[in-house]
Amino acid sequence: MLISYKWLKELVDIDVPSQELAEKMSTTGIEVEGVESPAAGLSKIVVGEVLSCEDVPETHLHVCQVNVGEEERQIVCGAPNVRAGIKVMVALPGARIADNYKIKKGKIRGLESLGMICSLGELGISDSVVPKEFADGIQILPEDAVPGEEVFSYLDLDDEIIELSITPNRADALSMCGVAHEVAAIYDKAVNFKEFTLTETNEAAADALSVSIETDKAPYYAARILDNVTIAPSPQWLQNLLMNEGIRPINNVVDVTNYILLYFGQPMHAFDLDNFEGTDIRVREARAGEKLVTLDGEERDLDVNDLVITVADKPVALAGVMGGQATEISEKSSRVVLEAAVFNGKSIRKTSGRLNLRSESSSRFEKGINVATVNEALDAAASLIAELAGATVRKGIVSAGELDTSDVEVSSTLADVNRVLGTELSYADVEDVFRRLGFGLSGNADSFTVRVPRRRWDITIEADLFEEIARIYGYDRLPTSLPKDDGTAGELTATQKLRRQVRTIAEGAGLTEIITYTLTTPEKAVEFTAQPSNLTELMWPMTVDRSVLRQNMISGILDTVAYNVARKNKNLALYEIGKVFEQTGNPKEELPNEINSFAFALTGLVAEKDFQTAAVPVDFFYAKGILEALFTRLGLQVTYTATSEIASLHPGRTAVISLGDQVLGFLGQVHPVTAKAYDIPETYVAELNLSAIEAALQPATPFVEITKFPAVSRDVALLLKAEVTHQEVVDAIQAAGVKRLTDIKLFDVFSGEKLGLGMKSMAYSLTFQNPEDSLTDEEVARYMEKIQASLEEKVNAEVR
């Protein structure tokens, strides 16, 4: 939020440098992003009076004679709205304007120009806040501007703008009144709020208008009627104030509603009463199929959860978000209905998010407003419009609903205050803090009760009182002390150790770590899962693409693969360590189980072609090798079982990874249909349950002595049926129970007509070693006999 320091000083009697105020506010709980002055960097820009203005033939240029105080200057200007008799902003030769541009004497089309007549944009004012009548031309100054004087004071460019970063819990500071209360408490000053005098006619507003509410999303709705309104530009002071606050001036009525928004934090809307088709204002939820053309000219399809303002049962505004075009204030408007209301913040947030219509009003309703000043803000707006637009105000407020404006009472004790803050404050100190805040206080040190005004709706519990005392007393004055605790040696948890081991293997294999979204679509959430669990959905998702907690990480990684492939980065090896979410109960009543997982995706080439070697593409066994390296590092003996149960994976190139009866994950090729949907080439993926792996890990052995005795290797070639798998052969070898067998390696696979139909040959290298003695040939021969017998029995192998 932007704060005009000039305006703030009207509300609180302070005279400190703006930077000092910014630091003080930051240390008491409201962060200040920075302080800027619109006039910073500008110089030698004065008021000029255009004495004459002549067109340059066959151009858009004008030759102007301009009085700048001491002398008359000729200036060539191309603005369409320049004319004789107006006061303008003139940058003299040597002046500095926006972007540190220096003005020099020059010639334009051969005509001497001794300066520049400036627009607001040329002084660095954003186009988004320049009044529309000056958007394509120069700024015209008030008639009382004195030629030769600096222009800054006429446009309040000499103001200082303080930018606040308001956290959700301090939405009370989204108004000048709220900020004034805060600053007054910091400096122990009184607030000086403006008194708005309202004069009403004898004609009752209730005779011309009725208000009703048909939903609990609108606790209160109030309206006033103004007649004889004259639409015109706002006075210069109001335009200056709005521009400094980042709001474009429109006209006197709309500008007053924005002024009240800034002053009270109360969103308002003005309707053209002459465009009402009835006399009954109703606040209700939209009906299916209803539409509304909003002020921006867009036709909006309304949702049944949207809150609307209707007249004659037709929507005329999206409550708290944007008004309708049909009842917009225009130059012809003479009768105006002013609206001030309280709407449900969640409803407003959902509507503004769905329609992507964010505004100053919607953000305030979302975060909360001061319900105690709704009617006061409405009266103030009516008073200002009467003053600036010559309007008459009908008697009374037409309203529906009720508001609880009573103070909130919160109790505590002095002992609790000092215990929590670590201070030795007296009851008088506590009294002083709440006096400065403008809160009521009763009781004594043993027990006191604070009466919190409705303007501070963030204070509801005892802890909030402690925070207020600490803020105003001063965080820098709180005593500091070191924790009274014995130091302990830091170490990694089992989960952290496992993650480090996984990262070491993955990155050693050339994989790059990425982080993908935990939230995804309902469809992608259950991809790559054989048995999907219940979906855990957000109640108020920002978008459908991020509405459900993921049950796998592969779909997110494939989105990243697709993004890179589309940008010609085709050789990819990506991995992620994160959480997936399993919901076995009712998602609305129970939290999902969070499972630590590791996943990767490989596509493209392992090695590119060069003059010596052919290109090596990624395949199933390359991906499996990465997992084998990981399981070897972890000391786990896993099995791979072919499966076709995971629909998103290739049925002939997919394996489930198990440790005993525990399924740890899967490995496989992305199904061609799924790959086409992601628009990616042939890709291999794997995902492991790290939580299950962590539970299966054995305590690390501190040290194992390296044997001094040599290992002995024997090769064996087996004739097998074609359907026998490598894993079945390994299981058969291990079933022989040879304790001295330390390694099994497959080094050759062969099939052909010589072996016979449906047969294949597999050759293995078997390694034996005794850590305590050298093995003899007789011992190794006995081991081989046992292994051969087991192979013949288990897989019907024939030793070649």
UniProtKB/Swiss-Prot annotation:
Which EC numbers characterise this protein's activity in its record? Answer: 6.1.1.20
> What range(s) does the FDX-ACB domain occupy?
707-800
Give the main localization category: cytoplasm
The UniProt record gives the binding positions of Mg(2+) as D458, D464, E467, E468
Q: What is written in the cofactor note of this entry?
A: Binds 2 magnesium ions per tetramer.
Q: Which residues form the B5 domain?
A: 405-480
Q: Which GO terms describe its cellular component?
A: phenylalanine-tRNA ligase complex
- Which reaction equations make up its catalytic activity? tRNA(Phe) + L-phenylalanine + ATP = L-phenylalanyl-tRNA(Phe) + AMP + diphosphate + H(+)
GO MF: ATP binding; catalytic activity, acting on a protein; magnesium ion binding; phenylalanine-tRNA ligase activity; transferase activity; tRNA binding
- Keyword Metal-binding found: yes
PANTHER family hit by this protein: PHENYLALANINE--TRNA LIGASE BETA SUBUNIT (PTHR10947:SF0), PHENYLALANYL-TRNA SYNTHETASE BETA CHAIN AND LEUCINE-RICH REPEAT-CONTAINING PROTEIN 47 (PTHR10947)
Subunit info here reads:
Tetramer of two alpha and two beta subunits.
**Stated name of the protein:** Phenylalanine--tRNA ligase beta subunit
Q: Which gene encodes it?
A: pheT
